Amino acid sequence: MTTTDTASETKPFQAEVAELLNLMVHSVYSETDIFLRELISNASDALDKLRYESIATPALMEAGGAPKIQIVPRKAPDTLTVIDNGIGMNRQELIDNLGTIAKSGTKSFLTKLTEAKDGAGLIGQFGVGFYAAFMVADNIVVTSRRAGSGEVWTWSSSGGAGFEIAPASEEAAARVVRGTEIVLHLKPDAAKYLEAYQIERIVSEYSDNIQFPIELVPEEGEPRQINSASALWQRSKSELTEEDYNQAYKQIAGAFDEPAMTLHYRAEGRQSYAVLLFAPATKPFDLFEPERKGRIKLYVRRVFITADADLLPPYLRFLRGVIDSEDLPLNLSREMLQNNPQLAQIRKAVTGKVIGELESLADKKPEDFARIWEAFGPVLKEGLYEDYERREKLLALARFTTTAGEKRTLSQYVEAMKENQTEIYYLVGDSIERLKSNPKLESATARGIEVLLLTDGVDAFWTSGQLDFGGKPLKSLSQGDVNFDLIPKLDADKPDDKPDETKADEATVIAVIKDALGERVSDVKASQRLTSSASCLVAGGFGPDRELEKMLARANKGAATKPVLEINLGHPLVAALADAKADKADATDLSFLLLEQAQILDGELPEDPAAFAGRLNRLVLRGLVAHG
């Protein structure tokens, strides 16, 4: 054979690969079947790549025969071999593809895999399924010839600290005319995978819809095809069963569960294309990784083009599946993918179909939709500020936890609104428990006004878009003024907690606090939000909500503006400020205490914790809090 380097070389695995291999070699996962599913999936990808590259270079297909995958079990010795005549790999590609993991989110993946009771689904999701073969093999030998190349290389490893890369032997080079041969030397407890019925069972369950022939090569007799080798998405819905779709989902998504939603249709007209999409029932571990993109595969006339074409908007990135176009050109470059008007039309139409299917599911199968919302609601809500065209539909689909204690739609909220209530109230925070104890809810709760409790990271952003639903604007209880005067309290006959004569004089108290706090706050106001707490902090009437301001400040994307301090004129602490006996030092301590306890209730620390503790001690010792 011809090669530029005839010497073998031992190389260490990348640290992340070594960690992953350690998990595989000492695997306690029960779903060891996935190793074969993953090897077949990789072989199918290699055949897809060959078919795509041969469009520009037809000579690549001249040697090696028609595309296929072969599985060869041999009991003496105990080896299982998976062969494809796909694109193959050269020396550097073997090193890069089998010795490193060039993916974002690797650290998060390994952490979750370590913690998982059964990591099979995670392995498939992350696309590192080759290493799953070490669950059943104590040594793996990979021989590969890249299509059109004269060089053949062998990669081998026992799953330890490294691997060996060397020119293939003459015998191996003669076997591998094009593509890749993977020989697994099975562990004693994995001998069952040499049985034909076990191989057929796994192929039937996970790989039947691989669109290339999968052949079982017995020790005696002729190879026989053991899969249907059809593009399921090109078949009519009437031909397919729920089980067919479940198997296709497991193959496409690398999953073990069943899909929460399936969308399959063919579009005809100005453009013709087939669509098969699945919504998983569980959340992928890397859903919020910054580099994560959509997982929809683009085919053109059954030729795989790319899985990186942004075929759906980012807020639908949890979907898995296939779009197969009859009209797009086969030679699509990355630039053409980004700017192709036909692809933009497909994206728009498919997005509309997905939203329509979610609406139908929410109406006809609310329990199935609830599973999707539970897993992917925070992602779908990204569309509320990304997709103006479909914002109203997405708002109607959204489910919210409220002070009523249940998941509600905005339609249900509006139906239950109090007489004279004109706004949809919400509060953003980091947990339901903390929101329920937030003092800004007090006046609304006293009137039986339902409030949306929003705790997803995206909530502070989409709510900043001045949205309305059914003509009712969404109103934050952390921003601007609120007016509940036209909505009576639930116990309307009960007098206010404090009669007017016991309330502090508004002008006097506000002047004292402003003088003490100076520029630490933008304003001091009497509150309509509070009934029992002394104070709270809110944002001004213009600009971002207070929670969004805090988030942006934590991310160093701008300093939070000075908040408005609202005070409860009926609270003893506030009334103490109006006491003529209070000297300036006491008034300053009380003013700062109102600000600092509001900061604590808002999830922040006082600017100077030591000073806060000092003034609190002074006030307690003087008895001002108890007797003011």
Swiss-Prot record:
This is Chaperone protein HtpG. The keyword ATP-binding applies. It comes from Rhodopseudomonas palustris (strain BisB5). Belongs to the heat shock protein 90 family. Residues 335-550 are annotated as: B. GO terms for molecular function: ATP binding; ATP hydrolysis activity; ATP-dependent protein folding chaperone; unfolded protein binding. Molecular chaperone. Has ATPase activity. Keywords: ATP-binding, Chaperone, Cytoplasm, Nucleotide-binding, Stress response.
